[in-house]
Amino acid sequence: MIGLVVEVKPIQAHFRIPYNSLLLDSYPFPPRTTAIGMLAGAMGLPEEEFRKLLTELGYGVIVEDPGARVEETAVIFKNPGSPLYPIKKILYHRPHYRLFFAGREETVERAYEALLDPVFTPYLGDSESLFYPAKREYARIVDVEEGEESTIRSVVLGDEYSKGARFMVLRRNNLTPREYSMPVDFIYRGKGRRAVYKRVVAFAGGYVELANPASVLLFDGEPVFVF
């Protein structure tokens, strides 16, 4: 198996957590559906092919730097005399992510080539969150192996974290571990779709020591939980 490692450092990022219409909260990392959707856009895939790509690629992410959390407030004008409801949007300014994708050689190589010469402009999240490479060689293909590890820097599966873990801080700008329901797939019914979620624990600025070694994929030696 081979993998694709993509290092990005956008000016801003927003990955909406869909639970409140007046608070546009954000995951502090690109969810699985967003990251694979970014590849699908770069590859110029229609919806049906995007659905197929979701089944062909595994995904993991390391939050190298969460960036600065920014709150943006706006009021939408409706009609004269109507009550005004301010809407708050959470953004992350200049975060730094390492995205990991694993799958069949043909699929991974096609995704890699698409990032170098995309059909559509890659976005990370909403339409204001443009994809910015973190460095010149921002995408690379690496060897991937199965393994077990207890020292992890990537987003962790919630079930493994709940068995026991401790967070070791390495940087001043950090995020303490917090559980999220990350969208990992979609169920389609007619013209509509519904997200499928998985419990994960995200953090930044350090690493997690799990109580027990867990199954991971090693991307050129880097242990990553893949969903």
Predicted regions, residues:
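Extracellular structured ligand-interaction cores
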Residues: 3, 56-58, 96
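Glycine/small-residue-rich interface belts in oligomeric ring/scaffold proteins
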Residues: 16-81
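Internal, well-folded beta-alpha domain core
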Residues: 64-227
